[in-house]
C-alpha cells in the first residue's frame, strides 16, 4: 500500500518528533513517499519548494502531483500541527487520511478558541489517529470520536552492559533540547547541592537549544563537574550514554498542563543502555519506566536530590535495575 507521509519534522532536523518519524519511516514495511520541506533529506523524500508545509495552494498542488505520480493510496500526517489545516482540504482527493499525534502539539492548539473548531473538525475527518502514549490517547478521547490507536514508541535494543565500580564517583546524565520545560537547571542545582553535601558527582549534558548559554553560566558557578556534549559525530550519543551511571530528565508541564511531555524517547534510549531513569512528572513520561524497578518519577529539585542520593548510597541498585532493563527490555514499548 503506497503511503504519503506529510511532515515538517524530518532528518536532519533535530528533536524528538523528527527522530520518531525517521525511525518510524525506516521500519515501515510498505511503500512510502515522504513529503517534507525543502531542507529535508532522505531516499524517499519529495521536497516541497517551501521551508514549511502548512496548507497553501502551492502545497495542495504539490501533494496532488505526488498522489498522481506515485499512485498514492493513503495519507499519513506525521504530526497534528500544522497538518490539521490540510485534512479537510485534502478530503476532495478521496483518500483515507490518518494522523500521528505525539503530545502537547495538539493540546496547545485545542486551547486556542480561533482554531479549536477547525482542529476538532479535522480530527473527525480522519480514519484513525495514532498516538505514542496512553496519556495522550486519553486526552484525545475527550475531544474526538475518531478511533485512537496506541502505536507506542521504541528504540533499538542495546547489548551494552556497563561494568560497575562502587568506589567511583557517580556520573549523572541528561539528554535533551535546552528549553525551560525540560528543567535541566533543576538537575544542575540538585547536583550542586549534592556535591556541597559531600557526594562526589559529575553531570554530563547532551543537547542543544536556546538556553545553552544560560545553562553553561549556571554550570560555571556550580560546585560539581559539568560537561557539555554535542552530536559532532554519529557515535557521540552512544559514547555519552556509555559513560553514565544514571539518567535524569525531569520534564515538567507548563501553561496549566497544556504543554507536556508526550512520552520521551530519551528515557527509552537511556533504558536501552541499562541505566536507571529518573523521569519527570509531565504527561506520559512515567509510561517509560516501571516505577521502583527501572526508575523513579521526580517532580522537584528536592526529589531529584533525594533520588540521586539514594543511588549514590546504594550503588548496587544501579546494577540491579540494569539487569531488570535487560530482562524486560520491551515493557511496554
Language model region names:
Residues 77-83, 101:
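Short His-centered aromatic/hydrophobic patch
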Residues 267, 271-272, 276-279, 289:
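Short hydrophobic beta-strand element within catalytic cores of glycosyltransferases
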Residues 213-238, 246:
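Nucleotide-activated donor-binding/catalytic signature segment of Leloir-type glycosyltransferases, i.e.
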Residues 102, 124-160:
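Donor nucleotide-sugar binding/catalytic pocket of nucleotide-sugar-dependent glycosyltransferases
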Residues 6, 164-182, 188-192, 204:
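Conserved donor-binding/catalytic core segment of Leloir-type glycosyltransferases
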Residues 324-333:
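Single conserved hydrophobic/aromatic residue that forms the stacking wall/gate
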Residues 242-260, 275:
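Acidic donor-binding loop of glycosyltransferase active sites
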Residues 290-302, 308-316:
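Conserved acidic donor-binding segment of nucleotide-sugar-dependent glycosyltransferases
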Amino acid at each position: 500500500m503506497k503511503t504519503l507521509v506529510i511532515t515538517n519534522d524530518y532528518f536532519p532536523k533535530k528533536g524528538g518528533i523528527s527522530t520518531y518519524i525517521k525511525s518510524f519511516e525506516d521500519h515501515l514495511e510498505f511503500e512510502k513517499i515522504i513529503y517534507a520541506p525543502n531542507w529535508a533529506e532522505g531516499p524517499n523524500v519529495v521536497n516541497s519548494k517551501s521551508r514549511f508545509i502548512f496548507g497553501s495552494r502551492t502545497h495542495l498542488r504539490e501533494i496532488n502531483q505526488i498522489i498522481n505520480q506515485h499512485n498514492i493510496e493513503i495519507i499519513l500526517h506525521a504530526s497534528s500541527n500544522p497538518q490539521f489545516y490540510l485534512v479537510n482540504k485534502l478530503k476532495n482527493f478521496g483518500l483515507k487520511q490518518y494522523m500521528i499525534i505525539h503530545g502537547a502539539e495538539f493540546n496547545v492548539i485545542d486551547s486556542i478558541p480561533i482554531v479549536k473548531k477547525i482542529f476538532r473538525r479535522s480530527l473527525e475527518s480522519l480514519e484513525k489517529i495514532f498516538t505514542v502514549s496512553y496519556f495522550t490517547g486519553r486526552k484525545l478521547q475527550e475531544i474526538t470520536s475518531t478511533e485512537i490507536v496506541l502505536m507506542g514508541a521504541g528504540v533499538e535494543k542495546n547489548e551494552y552492559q556497563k561494568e560497575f565500580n562502587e568506589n567511583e564517583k557517580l556520573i549523572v546524565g541528561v539528554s535533551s533540547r535546552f528549553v525551560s520545560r525540560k528543567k535541566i537547571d533543576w538537575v544542575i542545582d540538585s547536583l550542586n547541592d549534592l556535591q556541597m553535601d559531600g557526594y562526589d558527582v559529575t553531570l554530563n549534558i547532551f543537547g542543544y537549544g536556546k538556553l545553552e548559554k544560560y545553562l553553561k553560566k549556571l554550570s560555571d558557578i556550580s560546585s560539581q563537574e559539568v560537561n557539555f556534549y554535542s552530536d559532532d559525530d554519529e557515535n557521540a550519543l552512544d559514547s555519552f550514554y556509555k559513560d553514565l551511571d544514571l539518567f535524569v530528565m525531569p520534564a515538567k508541564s507548563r501553561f496549566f498542563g497544556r504543554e507536556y511531555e508526550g512520552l520521551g524517547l530519551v528515557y527509552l534510549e537511556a533504558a536501552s543502555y541499562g541505566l536507571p531513569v529518573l523521569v519527570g512528572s509531565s504527561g506520559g513520561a512515567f509510561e517509560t519506566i516501571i516505577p521502583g524497578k527501572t526508575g523513579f518519577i521526580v517532580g522537584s529539585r528536592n526529589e531529584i536530590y533525594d533520588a540521586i542520593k539514594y543511588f549514590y548510597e546504594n550503588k548496587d541498585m544501579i546494577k540491579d535495575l540494569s539487569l531488570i532493563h535487560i530482562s524486560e527490555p520491551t515493557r511496554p514499548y
